[in-house]
Amino acid sequence: MTSVEEMPLPPPTRLPPFLHARVGGLPRAFWALWAGSFVNRLGTMVEPFLAFYLTGVRGLSVTATGMVLALFGLGSIVSQFVGGVLADRVGRRATLTGGMLATAAAMLALGYATATPVLVALVFVLGLTIDAYRPASQALLADLVGPAERTRAFGLLFWAINLGFAVAMVLGGTLSRAGFSWLFWVDAATCVVCGVLVWRAVPETRGRRAEREPGGFADVLRDRVAVGSVLVVLCYGFVYLQAYSTLPLAMRRVGLPPSAYGFAMALNGIGIVIVQPLIGAWLGRRDHSRVLAAGVAVVGAGFGLTAFAASAWAFAATVAVWTLGEILFAAVSSAIVADLAPPHLRGRYGGLYGMAFALASLLGPPAGGGLLGLASWSPWLLCAILCGTAAAGALALGPAVRRRRRALKH
């Protein structure tokens, strides 16, 4: 059996019942991870503005920039794999902190690189480091929080990440006008703060593997339930990422200005910030597989309805629909992966989950843009079909997921 040190229970809280049901009862180490993630997201400025930096400051063509960003995406896939292995072998805390510090160093080096070959190499290096913390963070949360509270905890982390990212977009746009070097320094600084905070405030939680227990990535790939769940994530990610690539192109195609896209996406952030804390505790009491299926189906419906949108308000309405699905998906998807994973393999399971999203980021945007060029409705039909198929898959996997959830001992 894998041995995992039990985390001490949090002290009694005097929060009002409404707040206690939503944020109470979670260990202090979780809140340190939450705070570090929030600070890190407050400074997430380099990745969203990287295309602007490469074309506007370093003078790369649009085609060359696309190829460089593809290298970044490939690096991210490798990053998730390596981060998952290190989280299980070296430790969650060390991997998260090391990943954050390495990302900070890569960002500063990239910010001052001028020669194109060096620039391209450093973008790939940044891709290799930037997501290494994710599997460790997911495994750390699963170690710290018991199965009954994981849905709520993952939901709160999702909320913090989205709130921080929304603020970062505003700050990043402002700072970029003063000089792009500010973005690299602020992003690097928040990475360092996150890494140091986790190192000082969060204990190492990695369990020790018994000799006869499986312990490699191949063992994860032999887990059919986990692989099936990750395929659901891949389909969802393919569709969800159309919001940042194909959706703005579709809105421009019908004559809408960039401000209309900004308004629609602002509704996404506002919806998450308002709705997630209200329903997080309730979602924790629901069957995870059914919530996942519902979330994926609602996302498919929202993107499918985009085929009929022709005004700013119509596009905003479709965003509101799939935002609800995004909230449902985010609340349970990571919890399902954590429930499926043996404690000593949680990093690798989280790495496989992250690799699915990274692969979706490589496949989704070019496929969506290509289909939009053929027919304005075609990418949205594909989105609806993919999400419908994935939702059916999540329901089919439900009985196996429930059996595993009952069988695994935390």
Where are the language model's segments positioned?
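C-terminal membrane-cytosol helix-exit motif in multi-pass small-molecule transporters
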Residues: 189-208, 393-398
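Helix-loop boundary and gating motifs at the non-cytosolic
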Residues: 24-73, 227-264
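Helix-to-loop junctions at the C-terminal end of transmembrane segments
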Residues: 79-91, 275-288, 372
